[in-house]
Amino acid sequence: MTTNWLSDIEQSAWRNFVTTVPDLEAAFEADIASHDITMGDYKVLVFLSEADDNRLRMCDLADSLRLSPSGLTRRLDGMVKAGWIERSACSADRRVMYAHLTDAGMNKMRAAAPDHVESVRRHFLEPLGAKGVQQLSELFSRIRHHLQQTQDA
């Protein structure tokens, strides 16, 4: 079997993606650092803020964040200590644990949100322009759909 190597343009697209994503993440991280929060913690707060009753089962939160259960536990330990979230057991099934956004966590997220949105606009959206944003959204939707199809198969 022979390897179907990437063409020059395919290699360029792939390398640009692989190198740009960490650069974007670093820029977003730097732009909210003054709020004493990491992007990882910010993402947790956002997911919880969008959930019913501002809480999610730990397994669902881990899936949403693409973290292992132990990775989520490590992520949440500091957030619990900071008072941004609380963990609680499900009253109907003690094996199920919830992460719940506290008022302090909501306030932390709301304080960082304007700087995060500005960072997303400056580093991600503005360089693309309106047409580029539309195209990129469609392209990533196609990739996401493909990944979901292959994972379900």
List each language-model region with its residue ranges.
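Charged, amphipathic alpha-helical coiled-coil/dimerization segments
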Residues: 77-138
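N-terminal helix-turn-helix DNA-binding core of bacterial DNA-binding proteins
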Residues: 22, 26-70
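Alpha-helical linker/hinge and terminal dimerization helices associated
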Residues: 17-20, 24, 28, 65, ...
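Pre-recognition alpha-helix immediately N-terminal to the DNA-recognition helix
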Residues: 16, 43-47, 107
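N-terminal leader segment of winged-helix/HTH proteins
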Residues: 1-35, 84
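C-terminal regulatory/oligomerization modules of transcriptional regulators
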Residues: 1-8, 130-153
